[in-house]
Amino acid sequence: MTEARPAQEWNNVNSEVVAQFRSDNGKISSGMFKGARLLLLTTVGAKSGKERINPLAFTRDGDNYVVIASKGGSPTHPDWYHNVLANPEVGVEVAAPSGVEQFTAHARIAQGDERQRLYDAQAAVMPGFAEYQKKTSRAIPVIVLEPRR
């Protein structure tokens, strides 16, 4: 689902996806993420202190949402992951029957068996995630978003 692209190009793609998500009740109807099940994760920049919004694929685990810091199998973690480590209270926007639901959540990093179970669940739905792990020597972090409703 991701590939090597310059950072500015990804920023442009993210901005377009965020705009489409918000204008079409959480649906993505065009572009490279057409039809993808995404949420918007709002973090506070670890260095800048500015809000950052990233569209991310997700799965559910009970009441929680699960996102993966794959960065397409890159050798480095995505910036949003560093933001989560520095500031684990995040904002989430996700499609719901009545439109887009917004809530705050606490982000925690899954470890051990839980991490593997959640990663495997995402890879079962989106096989690209299995390929991402093969492309890198780093353990790709799995983040559990625990809603604060």
Predicted regions and their residues:
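Extreme N-terminal tail/first-helix region
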Residues: 1-34
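Short, structured beta-strand-loop surface elements
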Residues: 4-5, 71-129, 135-139, 147
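Short coil/turn segments at secondary-structure boundaries
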Residues: 32-36, 133-137
